[in-house]
Amino acid sequence: MSWIERIKSNITPTRKASIPEGVWTKCDSCGQVLYRAELERNLEVCPKCDHHMRMTARNRLHSLLDEGSLVEMGSELEPKDVLKFRDSKKYKDRLASAQKETGEKDALVVMKGTLYGMPVVAAAFEFAFMGGSMGSVVGARFVRAVEQALEDNCPLICFSASGGARMQEALMSLMQMAKTSAALAKMQERGLPYISVLTDPTMGGVSASFAMLGDLNIAEPKALIGFAGPRVIEQTVREKLPLGFQRSEFLIEKGAIDMIVRRPEMRLKLASILAKLMNLPAPNPEAPREGVVVPPVPDQEPEA
């Protein structure tokens, strides 16, 4: 027996620990290994470098609205492959795959509820659903959100995270840009606030329509915001773009957005702004969550 075999006989192999999949994750920015549950408690913000990772639509709405107040709207609306569109894959197959992966029927989730006791309607994009692209159902759900805000005489908040219009729906997708913008004009006529929160990324037809039409346009840190992407622009102008081009910090320097707010501070900041705009008491984070009295819907003047 060789000396190597004698050493091997005295070694007792340890039992390999089984770690369930999804317990740990890695920060996309700094590479820090993070405990998944802790990251979720921190609203998907890296505790080391403050990188704001992408957040699901439902988690975002649940983190915003008061617990027990959420009521979903427009969930019965489902996308249809009217054009029988096919690129490298059938559109209906892409829809089925996205629905299975995300558990959502389409890329926008709309809920009404309360924010520190104040009635609001909120919408959030699910970027994992075909890149948060805007099709007819996204447009219809957004209009439904506007109509609900008008009915309840309350503010509307939308969290955008989209690559733009959904090419598989062609002109029906592009039509949603005008449809959603026209709906927001009714909010303006009524004098109800609409706050647009731009998250990473907000691009294309969404940025060219309702995402930039807020009475206040707020962005998360380092969010990519624009129409065409930086690579497309560089290839078109054949020049190297400035560092941080199209990021929220660049845009606020140019006056394209109103403010940048970190995700953990977003809830209180939105509530404080809306309370001022609606002439309601300022939210108190320490006080128990109670409903507030919202001014009644103003009488409509008869049309001439």
UniProtKB/Swiss-Prot annotation:
Top-level EC class as recorded in UniProt: transferase
Provide the residue positions that the database annotates as binding Zn(2+).
Answer: C27, C30, C46, C49
According to the entry, every stretch annotated as the CoA carboxyltransferase N-terminal domain falls at: 23-292
Q: Which GO terms describe its biological process?
A: fatty acid biosynthetic process; malonyl-CoA biosynthetic process
The Enzyme Commission number assigned here is 2.1.3.15
Its family remark reads: Belongs to the AccD/PCCB family.
Give the start-end ranges of region Disordered. Answer: 284-304
Its localization reads: Cytoplasm
Task: Give the C4-type zinc finger regions.
Answer: 27-49
Q: What is this protein called?
A: Acetyl-coenzyme A carboxylase carboxyl transferase subunit beta
Native species? Shigella boydii serotype 4 (strain Sb227)
Q: What GO MF annotations does this protein's record show? A: acetyl-CoA carboxylase activity; ATP binding; carboxyl- or carbamoyltransferase activity; zinc ion binding
What is its biological role?
Component of the acetyl coenzyme A carboxylase (ACC) complex. Biotin carboxylase (BC) catalyzes the carboxylation of biotin on its carrier protein (BCCP) and then the CO(2) group is transferred by the transcarboxylase to acetyl-CoA to form malonyl-CoA.
Reaction(s) the record says it catalyses: N(6)-carboxybiotinyl-L-lysyl-[protein] + acetyl-CoA = N(6)-biotinyl-L-lysyl-[protein] + malonyl-CoA
